[in-house]
Amino acid sequence: MPEGKKRSLIERLNKGPVICAEGFLFEIERRGYMSSGEFVPMVSLEHPEALENLHRDFQHAGSDIVQAFTYNGHREKMRVIGKEELLEPLNRSALKIAKKVALDTPKGIEPNLMAGNISNSNIWNDKDTSSNSEVEKMFSEMVGWAVDEGADILIGETFYYAEEAYAALKAMKQSGLPSVITILSLIHI
């Protein structure tokens, strides 16, 4: 493959495993750039260099995908902490940082894919669906920003409800980008 050429997610999967580093929230907290509580990824605005360094650490550890750290960076979490006006700048900053790192791989290494990210909403309620249309709008706006900033794929992660994961997947599929969903079971075995 010519240097600098980037294969799609499907092309990579057809050749073998694809690694996507996870654990941003806890690692950023461990490094002192986030305190427990609402776990909103303000690091992309307040300490962008720390986020870039973490992406590079994951990249050097073998991650094939640089995932934008927008986990919990949705309208509801921003409303709760009184910073809803920073929602779009936070998301776009995280996406730009991820894109920068994805395009700047070490010499001889295939460029990483950059993933836009959405997560559970904390307000989805399978028994009272009145808030679910708000969640769908939150997913759509985050997907839109990821597309605008040049994401190669989308990842929806840590959904507790299958219905919410399906709503996320529906919004993600409208982008035309390859999409991956992860679901966290609340049933303890």
Could you describe each region identified by the protein language model?
Residues 22, 58, 98, 154:
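Conserved, mostly hydrophobic/aromatic
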Residues 19-21, 66-68, 114-116, 154-156, ...:
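Hydrophobic faces of well-ordered beta-strands that scaffold small-molecule active sites
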Residues 51-54, 87-101, 135-149:
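An active-site-proximal structural segment forming one wall of the substrate-binding cleft
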Residues 38-46, 59-61, 65-90, 151-166:
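Glycine-rich, proline-tolerant flexible connector loops at the mouths of alpha/beta enzymes
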Residues 60-61, 105, 109, 125-184:
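Alpha/beta enzyme core
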Residues 1-48:
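N-terminal basic, low-complexity leaders that serve as flexible interaction/assembly modules and, when applicable
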Residues 67-77, 115-126:
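Substrate-binding cleft and catalytic face of glycoside hydrolase catalytic domains
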Residues 187-189:
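Conserved small/polar residues in nucleotide/adenosyl-binding loops
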